[in-house]
Each structure stands twice: as C-alpha cells, then as structure tokens.
Amino acid sequence: MVRYSLRKAHEYARDGENQEVLGEISQAIMYYGLAKSQFEKICQNTAQPLIKRCANNQIEELMVRIRELRESLPNKQTPISMSMSTRLSPMYTSSLTPRFTSNSMVLPGDHNTTVRLKPSFREALMEDSEDDLYQMYSKFEMQVKKLSTNYGLAVAFSIVPMDDDQPSPSIFSSDESFLIVEGDDFSLGNSVEEDANATSKEDPAYQNTNEQIQPLSNFDISQQEYLNNTRIPYENEDLHLQHITQGTTDDNNVSKFLIPSYNDAKELSEEEMGRSHKREESFKRAFGHASSSESSIGEITDSREDIQSNRLVNGSWENNDFTKEINNNFPDRSETPTLQTIEAPTKLMKYTRRKSLFRFPFFRSISGKKKEEPMESGTDSLESSTAQITVDSQLKIKQLETQIATLQKQLEQFQTSTLDQDLH
C-alpha cells in the first residue's frame, strides 16, 4: 500500500512538471497538490507504526530492567532489615572490597548474635584455601559491634545473593552502600590512652558530684569536727606552728616539716627526705601546670602542707604571689573540700576521630555481559527502509510546498498581466 501510494505521488509530481513546461500553471498546481496529499498519507501510514514500535521497544526494555532489579534483591534467607540498614548512613560508606565481604551479618537490636547464611558453591570451593577472601575478620566484627552499641550507627555486614557462576557477589547490584570500618579509626581505648593530658578515672575531680568526699587519713581530727569546719585554720602562722608542735615528735612524722627548701631537698638522701619523690611530682604539677592523672587528693593536700611548713620554718613567706599560686594550684584545707574548690587541671578532651579513609558512597549501575548486537533480520531491514521512506517523503513535501508557493506567485503575476493587456 505504501509503495503504491509512493508510485502514485511520483506520477502526480511528474504530471505537474509536464503541465508547468507546457505553460498550464493551474493544472501543474493541481497535480502538485495531489502529489503532496499522497506524500502526507505515506508519512501518516509509516510514522504511526514506527511510533508504536518504538514505544513497544521502550516498554520491553523497562520490563527487562525491572526483572533484573528484582532478581538482584536479597533472597528470602536474607532479612529485609539488613538492606535497609545499609542505606541509612550513605555518607559513612565506601565501596565494597573483597576483604570485608562476608556471609554473616549482625541482626539489628542484637549485637551479640550473628546469623550464618548458607554458603555458596564458590565458598565451598574456597573453604580449604588459606587466602579465603570471604572469611570473617574477628577484628572487623568487634569494631562493628562496638560501633552499633556505643554510637547507634546503622552498621551491618552487607550480603548480596551470589550465584555459582558470578565472578563477584554483587555484580548485579544496582544500589550499593556498605559501611567499611578502617582499622583503628574508631578505637575508643587507643584514643583515650593517646591523649597527652588525659586524666585518670580514679581522679575524684571527675567522679560523680553526688558522692561525698571523705576526709583524708592523715588528719588528726575527727570526721564530725572535719565536716563541721571547727578545726584549726592554717592561715594563722602562730596557730599553724602551735598545731605542728602539738603533734607527735616521731622522727618520721616531723622530718617532713624540717626540709628547708625544694632545692636542698633534692640533694638529700631518700632516708632524710621521706616522701621526696612524691613531693617532686607535686611541685612539677604545681609550677608546670601539668596533669595530675597519677595523683590523688591526699597527695595534693599533703604537698600543700609541706610547702607551707617549709616557708614557715624559714621564718617568713617569700611573697604574696607565691601564696596565691599555691592556693590556686592546691585546694584550701581550711574548708571542706568539694568539687567546686578542687580545680580540675585539665578537662577530658572530646573524642575526635582521626582522619578517616572513608570514601564517598559508590553506587554501581547495572553491570553484566555486554549484549551482542543482533544481526539484522527481515523485519529490521523493512523497518529501516520504512523509516527512510518517511524521511524522504517529508523532504519531498517541503520541496513541493515551496514549488507550489512559487507557482502560485507566478500564476498571480500572469493573471495580473493578462488583465492589464485586456484593459489596453
């Protein structure tokens, strides 16, 4: 039908050319119009099947894509919550590497149990191999459990169903986002130990504020007297000296009050110094503003007592700045020690993760074997020829339209010229 209409259109166009040569412009316009209508009919008859065929091809491609996506989804053995959890934190994810590929997973809400899925045929072959890329790494599992417990992140071992003939476990996965923990990036223990000014957990300055601080063991007063703040104040020099002389005269107890200065104490032997080692550490913490992570409240207050006793034996305090510096670095024993009067030397540093090796999320598009281009069959060749006919017909229509417009102008000019001749 298309070929008949095409032949008929060419005949009309040829007749129009003949009439144009003979001078019958009106007849030529009529034949050109018939040829144009024939070409328009050809375009309509050939374009509709092409559009329908293209739409069917697109629908078929979409159906194939949907089927491939459904096949790439986890099977019934894999919980659905696992695939959901891997998409909750895409910015903390990196591309899948064979090292952390596993066939076990952590169930959400239960961080101590792992589910062992059925091993695939590929894993069965590699079970006896020493270089098993799909084995479970205990350190990685421990880090995942720690993160999921402490930080509440969406961490899980990611599993993709693997067929026997697949070269990788996720070749048909269209949306991959796996959380990979790099070594010691989230090692909480190492980060606290590496802090230079980290304080000890035994430091009472960082204990609960609700806990009552008990009086020190070297006080020679009762607990009730200590709590009522009725003991002798140490700010008065005479009372302080009187309090020292009222104590026992044992050499071991008195020797610590007889050391003239810190520099002289360094030259004495340990038998004469008594607690010289602890006093050296106290001085270093006082004047170097170092951390008191290895000291306790008792050692700090005893060191302050030693400093005051040394200055008192020498006869007078050196200056007020020295007294203020001691009072700022050591708690005042004239008051009940509380967490407000004990100044924390350093605060616990906020945990900051070192520069991570995480990469941006890697979303793999559908990958597989490259489709081979099929050989052109009879229907394909017919379709291509039909499309070519449509294109040629559209070009021919444009040419005929321009030719008709030109002839109409010539016809108008001819009619006007004949009218002028008749008038004359």
Swiss-Prot record:
Please note every region of biased composition (Basic and acidic residues).
268-284
Q: Which residues form the signal peptide?
A: none
Keywords for the protein's UniProt record, in alphabetical order: Autophagy, Coiled coil, Cytoplasm, Meiosis, Membrane
Where do the record's region annotations for Required for interaction with atg8 lie? 73-212
Which parts of this chain are annotated as the region Disordered?
A: 268-299
- Origin organism is Schizosaccharomyces pombe (strain 972 / ATCC 24843)
Q: Output the lineage of the source organism.
A: Eukaryota, Fungi, Dikarya, Ascomycota, Taphrinomycotina
Say if the entry is tagged with keyword Cytoplasm. yes
Q: Which gene encodes it?
A: atg38
Q: Name one GO cellular component term.
A: phagophore assembly site
Q: Which family does it belong to?
A: Belongs to the ATG38 family.
Compartments where found: Preautophagosomal structure membrane; Cytoplasm, Cytosol
State the name under which the record lists this protein. PtdIns3K complex I subunit atg38
List the InterPro entries hit by this protein, alphabetically: MIT_dom_sf
Q: Which residues form a coiled coil?
A: 50-78, 390-420
Q: Which GO terms describe its biological process?
A: macroautophagy; meiotic cell cycle
